[in-house]
């Protein structure tokens, strides 16, 4: 500190006017400061050294043209302003506390301010870096990381700290919050601010960042935010992103950010049973991602390299959910699948019994809420035979639902595999609304066994539909004492879904309202 500074302002950095002798009334001269107290030899020595080191008085500059006129003008202005104006002006330069009546205002004033600062941060890299002033006490009070940095066992004594991995705007947002509780984030800075808040353990600011992201979550940024949520370990935000992707899958996978996600995020999405999109469109999106990943890894974009970068993600594409036409026109010709896989899938599409394939054939259901089911029979009996004729029953409901599958009876002869084709037909137009050619395994019990559609089938209120199941396999159990009307009541809302069953005209393999197959309808409301 310069010898002319005030002893009561020792913590102030050079050049900041905060006390007498700095821009105000003249303080003691250098020679006066060097005068020791009588009888104090140590002080005398120190004062002598200070006096020797102090520069001599600076000679006044020679008067230039107009100097006298300028001085006279200044005197006239001071007289016009009144005798106390100059003193008030000088006081305002250092007595900033007087205009800040609350602690919050005083600390907010110190934000990004050289006044009283005792540490500087060199934030960022290269030309974009900034030198930001701060106050150790304020930072230590607001952050355990800063507390350890300044006061812990390995505390730094440096007054300049480099932070090359932090963005200046994000660090300023962090300081703004620590000094004033004010949240200053926007779309361009929220992710870097979240990173900085986590780095310095400021959970309240983390929560503000996550809340901002939730409010601004859309289909076109869901994948980008999902990647960041997984990176920063924000499970609640990640869950919201996945729900948004489920509901808006088609829009999300066409957004620019989709091809920028990492492999683990891609796998997390492909594992979901709740994506609302046809599998062939999902495959096409994954192919686009593989091209971008090849470029990131500086690999030539070839079918072999696409397969390489996809890794385990390829096994999560549910090729059996495609139609044979979709598979033949796309995946079969892509070169990503090996010949053995292509042949196996073509056999799966065309022959019965269907050979097992390496790929998942479980349908994706894009519906939210709890799965429901009703059973129309009150009792189970033995021996129901099959000769290639469909078991059919007509039904209607009182409200809109989505049917995702049927529960069917299995063998009376122990564990057995069945081949089955299930359909829902619009009765009046004879239009097939949904079907699946698949199979199921049973354990020989009288339980029902789930057989699911590839996609949910929308069923409208008070419209007649026909449920069909064509089984190939040994004699099975069957239901008796059938109910014409069955009501499902939601345990949470009390809402009622009422099914009415009727005889379906034609050959039904014996199934009717009273007895037969297709005991169970599985649906979402």
UniProtKB/Swiss-Prot annotation:
Gene name for this UniProt entry: BTBD2
InterPro entries according to UniProt: BACK, BTB/POZ_dom, PHR, PHR_sf, SKP1/BTB/POZ_sf
Species in which this protein is naturally found: Homo sapiens (Human)
Compartments it resides in: Cytoplasm
Protein's UniProt keywords contain Metal-binding: no
Designated name of the protein: BTB/POZ domain-containing protein 2
Keywords: Cytoplasm
Cellular component GO terms held in the UniProt record: cytosol; P-body
Skewed-composition ranges (Gly residues): 16-26
Pfam families xrefs: BACK (PF07707), BTB (PF00651), PHR (PF08005)
Bias-annotated ranges (Low complexity): 27-55, 66-86
Lineage: Eukaryota, Metazoa, Chordata, Craniata, Vertebrata
PROSITE patterns (alphabetical): BTB
Compositionally biased residues, Pro residues: 56-65
């Amino acid at each position: 500190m310069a010898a002319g500074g005030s002893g009561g302002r020792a913590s102030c950095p050079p050049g900041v006017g905060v006390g007498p002798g700095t821009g105000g009334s003249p303080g003691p001269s250098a020679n006066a400061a060097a005068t020791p107290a009588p009888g104090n030899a140590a002080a005398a020595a120190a004062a002598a050294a200070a006096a020797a080191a102090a520069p001599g008085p600076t000679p006044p500059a020679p008067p230039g043209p107009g100097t006298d006129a300028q001085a006279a003008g200044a005197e006239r202005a001071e007289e016009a302003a009144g005798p106390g104006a100059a003193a008030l002006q000088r006081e305002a330069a250092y007595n900033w506390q007087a205009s800040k009546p609350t602690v919050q205002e005083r600390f907010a004033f110190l934000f990004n301010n050289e006044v009283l600062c005792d540490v500087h941060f060199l934030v960022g890299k290269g030309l974009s870096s900034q030198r930001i002033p701060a106050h150790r006490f304020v930072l230590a009070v607001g952050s355990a990381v800063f507390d350890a940095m300044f006061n812990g066992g390995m505390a730094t004594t440096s007054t300049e700290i480099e932070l090359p991995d932090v963005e200046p705007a994000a660090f300023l947002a962090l300081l703004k919050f620590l000094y004033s509780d004010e949240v200053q984030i926007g779309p361009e800075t929220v992710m870097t601010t979240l990173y900085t808040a986590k780095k310095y353990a400021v959970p309240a600011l983390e929560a503000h960042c996550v809340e901002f992201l939730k409010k601004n979550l859309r289909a076109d940024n869901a994948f980008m935010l999902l990647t960041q949520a997984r990176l920063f370990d924000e499970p609640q935000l990640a869950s919201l992103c996945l729900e948004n992707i489920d509901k808006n899958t088609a829009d999300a996978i066409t957004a620019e950010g989709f091809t920028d996600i990492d492999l683990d995020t891609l796998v997390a999405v492909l594992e979901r049973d709740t994506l609302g999109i046809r599998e062939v469109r999902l495959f096409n999106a994954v192919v686009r991602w593989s091209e971008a990943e090849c470029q990131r890894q500086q690999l030539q974009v070839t079918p072999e390299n696409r397969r390489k970068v996809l890794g385990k993600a390829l096994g999560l594409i549910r090729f059996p959910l495609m139609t044979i036409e979709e598979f033949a026109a796309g995946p079969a010709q892509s070169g990503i699948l090996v010949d053995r896989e292509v042949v196996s899938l073509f056999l799966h599409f065309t022959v019965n019994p269907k050979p097992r394939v390496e790929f998942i054939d479980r349908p994706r259901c894009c519906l939210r809420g709890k799965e429901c089911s009703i059973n129309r029979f009150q009792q189970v009996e033995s021996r129901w035979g099959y000769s290639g004729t469909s078991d059919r029953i007509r039904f209607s409901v009182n409200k809109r639902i989505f049917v995702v599958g049927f529960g069917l009876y299995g063998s009376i002869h122990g564990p057995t595999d069945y081949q089955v084709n299930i359909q829902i037909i619009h009765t009046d137009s004879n239009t097939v609304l949904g079907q699946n050619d698949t199979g199921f395994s049973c354990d020989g019990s009288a339980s029902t066994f789930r057989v699911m559609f590839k996609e949910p089938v929308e069923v409208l209120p008070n419209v007649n539909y026909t449920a069909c199941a064509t089984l190939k396999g040994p004699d099975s159990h069957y239901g008796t004492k059938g109910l014409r009307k069955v009501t499902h009541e939601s345990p949470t809302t009390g809402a009622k879904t009422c099914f009415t069953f009727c005889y379906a005209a034609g050959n039904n393999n014996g199934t009717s309202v009273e007895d037969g197959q297709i005991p169970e309808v599985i649906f979402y409301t």
